[in-house]
Amino acid sequence: MRYLVFQLTLHGMKQRRRHIPRLKLMTLVILLLTIIAWVAWSFWPSSARQMKRSVGIVACQSWYEMVCKGKTILYFADIATDTALVRPSLQQDSCVRTTYSTGVWVNRYAFIPSCRGRMITVMAKPDEINRQDAWTLIEKEKERNEKRIRQLRDQLKELNYYLRINNVHDEGYNTVAAYAYEKEAEKAHCIRLARLFDTMRQADRPQLIRKAVYTAYYRLPNGECQQVRMREVGSSKQCQTVLLQTIGRTTPTGVAPLSIFFVNGKANGTALAVGYGGLGVEELASSDASCSIIPTTLHDNRHDLPAVLGGDGSPVFSTSGYFIGITKGNEVITRSQLRDLLRKEEQP
């Protein structure tokens, strides 16, 4: 009896040994087929629907803060070409500047679903301002402000003189009175700024810091518009590209991230672009814009897409649906340049 049990046990062990290589082989075959299917799917061109689902609108709300002794004492929207501070204010809300561009959802790795909320857009970022340059800007702005106060005082003298000698309260009188009231308020604002500048010293080492808040707008398959907060995780000064990622590091539902392969797409011939109408024109830009597919022609990585049909950041595809790059001005930023940006991602 014992011998029979021993023989049965031995036979079972031999059978299991035969099955183990088969199981490994089957697992290997399934894994290999899965990899082949995934690579083939990755190389599969985008459909028109997927092209539209790969884009979103990026809204950048930016402003500058003047920080002195660790405290923010002044806000302004931008720095003009003549170094003037644009819309300086004691309140942040009155100097926020909003710019729009097209963003493209992307995978970090070509053959792996690795988007995790990553988006690439084109947006110029100004250089950082060192402390010495900051003090120079402050001194120049102080001089401009004092000059503006003198101009406003002269204007108000003339306006008040007109109001005194023309005391008939007709339509013309009311218009001038309202204008004088606006100038009086502007003078009061400039005087408050002058008092602030008078309290500042170079020894206080004031700083000018740029702040930016990014929001991505995208549409669900049913057309409903959604928005999600983004953070900057990388940028390229040369290409003026910015790599963004959702705060939660998750890919929104309904979007179709693009994979950026290792070989650049074609540089000449007919192509397709996905653009938001009006987004490339400051007066028409809005987060409510809808995207469309527009034909274009490439010549040495340059396109002929009008800005009113597709602004910076619009993705360009071959007529077969393969991703080529994104627009910046009348140029196309290539896949290799976009891959370089993904390599610069800052790790949390």
PLM regions and their residue ranges:
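Short, positively charged
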Residues: 77-86, 289-299, 348
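N-terminal Sec-pathway targeting helices
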Residues: 11-32
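N-terminal intrinsically disordered, acidic low-complexity segments at the extreme N-terminus
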Residues: 1-13
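Flexible, gly/ser-rich surface segments that form the specificity/activation loops bordering the active-site cleft
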Residues: 43, 98, 223-225, 231, ...
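Extracytoplasmic
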Residues: 50-58, 96-101, 106-109, 114, ...
